[in-house]
Amino acid sequence: MNRNFVVLILVLIVIALLFYPVIFKNRETARNLDSKGLSVDTLQERPNDKELRTDKIRSSRRNAITNAAEIIEPAVVSVNVIKTKMVKRRRGFFFGFYDEVPYNIQGIGSGVIFSKDGFIITNAHVVEGATEIKVILTDTRQFDAKVIGIDKSHDISVLKINGNNLPYAKFGDSDDLIIGEWAIALGNPYGFLIKDSKPSVSVGVISALNRDFAENNDGKIYRHMVQTDAAINSGNSGGPLVNIYGEIIGINTFIFSESGGNIGIGFAIPINTVKKSARELIEYGKIRQIWFGFKVQELNQLIASHLKLKSLDGVLVNYIQRKSPAALTGLKEGDIVVEINGNTIKDTRDAELAVSDISVGDKIRIGILRDGKPLEIVLNAVENR
């Protein structure tokens, strides 16, 4: 009996020694949790933990694009126009006579304020022919706008509104763009259609640079265009294309699309071109026309053979106006223009594009071939009065 009792005691001691570290460790853990204001029950997720996790997710959603959109958004405006068009109306039911009567057409576009004085950039095609222009800001304020000037060839217009505490955007540098970098297109295409006056935002990248297009039927020449896959449509035409810093790098202008919807090929006028036109329009109310004083024509095989030219690249000077800048700088009929301001000239289209960005006061460096020898002539761009 005593022997069995001793054995039982020994077994209990062994069991105690085996399980004591585990019990001690659990008690230590409990004491540590208690010292931190926690308990085993609170190790499960609490409501506050969920809120903290939600805050982290929310903060992680903020990035360079959302920041850029917030910076530029207040300066983006809706441009609402009324254009009057004369339409024919039958004078009587049984007679083939018609009267021309005015008919108002409402148009919608976008724009961006670029100065605290209330100057706005938009496309010329948005406001051309408008009899009434109303601008709506993102804070719902509405202003009647005045056209300061239109640069039709570059499809740029400057408007002016009068108001206090106007938001405005900063210009970037379109000569410092990188293919593949983020591009953000904004516009306010809804105007009076919806109550919300906030602009729409679409995101893409700079797809290509320096896209040139020949003069279209409206007399517009698009040069050095910025191509982007950020969605551009008729409503955000005139709105800004911005970089990740919220700086304007272009003005949304048109898309390539048979259906009219965005298919990832949109084009914006580079902001450096816009700045040049805007300064001219604000100072003079128009784009001053340049007097060159010479005309050119395409080369053909007959001309090339007669002048012993090795190729058909270049344009032939076929007329020089007396006492013109061209005449004063020594340009002559029969000269072959092969370069203008560093741009290779192969035909008259190249020549038109090369001079489209030139303003009064600029110097024009013209590379020519005369009697087979290369020469350079510097022509001063003066206003055509």
Sequence positions of predicted segments:
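C-terminal recognition in membrane/secretory proteostasis and scaffolding
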Residues: 1-42, 67, 146, 178, ...
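Active-site loop architecture of trypsin-fold serine endopeptidases
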Residues: 4, 49, 53, 130-133, ...
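Glycine-biased strand-turn-strand hairpin within the trypsin-fold
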Residues: 28-120, 128-134, 141-142, 214-227, ...
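Short, surface-exposed secondary-structure boundary micro-motifs
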Residues: 82, 125, 188-189, 254, ...
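Gly/Ser-enriched beta-turn/beta-hairpin loop segments
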Residues: 87-104, 148-154, 194-199, 209-226, ...
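Gly/Ser-rich catalytic serine loop of serine hydrolases
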Residues: 103-111, 169-173, 226-242, 318-328
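Conserved active-site neighborhood of the chymotrypsin/trypsin-like protease fold
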Residues: 106-108, 113-195, 313, 345-346, ...
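Conserved positions in beta-strands of structured domains
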Residues: 112-114, 125-127, 146-149, 207, ...
